[in-house]
Amino acid sequence: MTVKVRFDKEVREYAKGEKVKDSVLKITETALAQALEKFHRRMIVIEGDTLKKAELAGILAGASARVLSDIVGELIEKRLRDESEDKIEVLYATDALGEETFGRKRYEAFRKHFDVLAGSEVNVTAVTFKHTREILGRTYDLLILDMSYDYSPNDLGRIIETVRGGGLIFILAHPFEKWKDMWTGFHKSLVTPPYTIEDVKKRFNRRLIRKFTQHDGIYIITESGKAKKKPKKSKSQAKIRARKGVEIPEETLFPKELYEMALTRGQVEVLKAFEELVDKEGMLVLTADRGRGKSVSVGIAAIGLAVALKKRTRIVVTAPELENVQSLFRFAKRALEKLGFKPYVVEEKGLIKELYARKIGLRYYPPAEGYKKNADLYILDEAAGIHVPILHKYLNKPRVVYSSTIHGYEGAGRGFSVKFLKKAREKRSFKELHMEEPIRYAYGDPIEKWLFDVLLLDAEPVELTEEDYELIKRKEVYLEEPDLDDWFENDREDLRHFVGIYILAHYRNRPSDVALLADAPHHEARVLRLKNGKIVTAVQIAKEGGIPKNVIDKMAKGYKPRGNIIPDMMVKHHYLKEFARLKGYRIVRIATHPDAMDMGLGSKALELLEKEAREKGLDWIGSGFGASEELVRFWVRNGFAVVHLSPARNPVSGEFTAIVLKPISKKAKELIKKANDEFRIRFTEWLGDTHRELEPEIARWLFETPFGEAVDYPIHLTEIQKKRLDAFTGKVLTYDTVVDAVKPIVKLYFLDGWMKPYLDERQIKLLIYRVLQAHSWEETAKLIDRTEMFTMIEVRDIIRGLWYYYKRLLT
């Protein structure tokens, strides 16, 4: 079917009255015709520094909405949009919509012309970047993205991907020559003492501008109508091809109405895979690029399963954030309505959190909570954004579905496959499905290519050869500070390799991480290169400290400066104001090439970074991270002292955050030892309260110290307590009657230096779990896989040895 994509006489006369050149209308017509014919998106960037650019966007978007409204019926008939989507949806996103703000003025200038031309069959949604959560899971035909003052790369990824094939994106931008030297609101958020806005770089803006000019499908005009980048030839009609028909299986367990909602073969396969979970328990792993309808399919299939089970069905839905599952919930709701249900929806801040209909219930829980709930089905959406230990908590569930984006603004990458699926295969068999056919837009969409390129969403590390592994074994590596100007300005492959290591090795990456590296004055990169130049370890550091006295005094009273995470913690939690004057490197992220893990490269990078810091006259190096056993052990074994542990677990990773420090200067050593001693004292008490559920194998490493000395902390026992300890170790009294006397002895052990009685791993875990965390004998016996009687005897034997050793110190 061929449709005419030409603005009518009324539009042309209106545009002429507003002094809009006919050539600009033709660029817009051509862009829309191309988008409709290819089922791709197209972008028009409007440069300018007055309200004219918003007015021009209003005219061009209004004219486009008018054309789309005329053909919406044909688009539904061709299965390019759902029958419920019978109105043209327009999204306007800007930094501010409050009265008297420039963002509001631009929006009003846009609406002044848009409302005249667009017609009544159009819905307009206006949001600020702070509220883009509300649009997730929705799809739009036209987007006006006001980037005149502020935006963050996260906003860019999130918003652009809501536009469907056949749609247009209008970018309101400053003149490029001016924009490349401008500071945005995002830049202001990067200022941290002792730096000023003058120190903030503009590398990311320049990269963005360059990518506008390099990629196909993007046209650039000025607010006065000058075309700086236009289509090679004009186009005023589009041949619209129907989406390929989907073959519905003759025999299905799920209602046919649900299969009729499927737009691609991939979605049908998801429904069939869910059918296999009706009669038997099982696990399904579903992966896809963005825009493939993955979450939509899971939402529909979950309802199919609930109906087919013919019983009260509870479904736990989890994802890194509630915003990640909005498509899933919306289509689950639509599926229920298709089947004649009247679903009840519970929302939180405009986002669906719970969905109920008769005997069916879907509810969202944070990843660290969901596995504790009883349910018939567990769905983990955007699973690559959930920390691996939490993913494993769901592995033994009877029916579980892991669903994940391989690329996209969540920044998942192949890390999900590398870090989780490999180990999951050893524990359980499961079915894997990969969805390839796009739903929101067709293959080869130029805007997707542009987005992936500008935000480095598909970056991957360099390939390693056998020769490379030999170099790694011999540690023929060197640490280098790359020239970030060169990386970003000249689009070096090294930048992609650097970011690619993080995408594969880290559980969560966001586009703003790249902009932070590009522009933050206190952030720098270091790379560990092989002799042949290949990057095998990526390190991102933040320079912290050197804070003026007046700011330190404010910090002590509660002020929290941006950045300076470690100095702020040392001032607030350890009252060591002088630490904030010292300078150091906070290691923001350190990751090794996934094919070169456990080969000592991370430790080598730390060794060389410490050497560099020493040569530069810095006082310390440190880091903050999710406290897993593996990571705490890594940092402690590299000579770092633990100085803080957060009181609550991260809701996504399920981990407490630890902060570690390694002194370089004499003054830093004195202060860090004080903080480490204080932390160890506090930790003996926290384990019975805020950290009672902390895994003992992690706790044992948090007690380790690089200083080798006992904490100067007086332990006092009365003469009666000493006699009762003698009676307990002599099998006269039971443990429960002498806890008050046992606990100080165990504290003494954990606060001691290196010259203390030897205990093996199991014995250390027993003391932490039973004595400091006060778990029951039953729970403690389960921990070491022994009987309660054996556990009681072992604890008595350990205490006997400790009491014999420390008795002489307490006389």
From Swiss-Prot:
Name of the protein this chain belongs to: tRNA(Met) cytidine acetyltransferase TmcA
Main location: cytoplasm
Induction: More highly expressed at 85 than 65 degrees Celsius (at protein level).
Keyword line: Acyltransferase, ATP-binding, Cytoplasm, Nucleotide-binding, RNA-binding, rRNA processing, rRNA-binding, Transferase, tRNA processing, tRNA-binding
A GO CC term assigned to this protein in UniProt: cytoplasm
EC number: 2.3.1.193
Gene that encodes it: tmcA
Entry keyword Lyase: no
Keyword Acyltransferase: yes
Enzymatic reactions: cytidine(34) in elongator tRNA(Met) + acetyl-CoA + ATP + H2O = N(4)-acetylcytidine(34) in elongator tRNA(Met) + ADP + phosphate + CoA + H(+); a cytidine in RNA + acetyl-CoA + ATP + H2O = an N(4)-acetylcytidine in RNA + ADP + phosphate + CoA + H(+); a cytidine in tRNA + acetyl-CoA + ATP + H2O = an N(4)-acetylcytidine in tRNA + ADP + phosphate + CoA + H(+); a cytidine in mRNA + acetyl-CoA + ATP + H2O = an N(4)-acetylcytidine in mRNA + ADP + phosphate + CoA + H(+)
GO molecular function: 18S rRNA cytidine N-acetyltransferase activity; ATP binding; mRNA N-acetyltransferase activity; rRNA binding; tRNA binding; tRNA N4-acetyltransferase activity
Positions with a binding annotation for ATP: Q267, R440
Function of the molecule: Catalyzes the formation of N(4)-acetylcytidine (ac(4)C) at the wobble position of tRNA(Met), by using acetyl-CoA as an acetyl donor and ATP (or GTP). Catalyzes the formation of 404 N(4)-acetylcytidine (ac(4)C) sites in RNA, almost always on the middle C of a CCG motif. There 173 ac(4)C sites in rRNA, 35 in non-coding (nc)RNA, 119 in mRNA and 77 in tRNA. More acetylation is observed at 85 and 95 than at 65 or 75 degrees Celsius.
PROSITE patterns for this protein: GNAT
Family: Belongs to the TmcA family.
Binding site for acetyl-CoA: I590, A591, T592, E630, R637
N-terminal signal peptide: none
HAMAP family, alphabetized: tRNA_acetyltr_TmcA
A biological process term (GO) from this entry: tRNA acetylation
Phenotypic consequence of gene deletion: Grows at 85 but not 93 degrees Celsius, loss of N(4)-acetylcytidine (ac(4)C) residues in tRNA, no change in thermostabiity of bulk tRNA. Complete loss of all ac(4)C in rRNA, tRNA, ncRNA and mRNA, decreased growth rate starting from 75 degrees Celsius, very slow to no growth at 95 degrees Celsius.
Protein location: Cytoplasm
Domain called N-acetyltransferase: residue spans: 474-663
CDD domains: NAT_SF
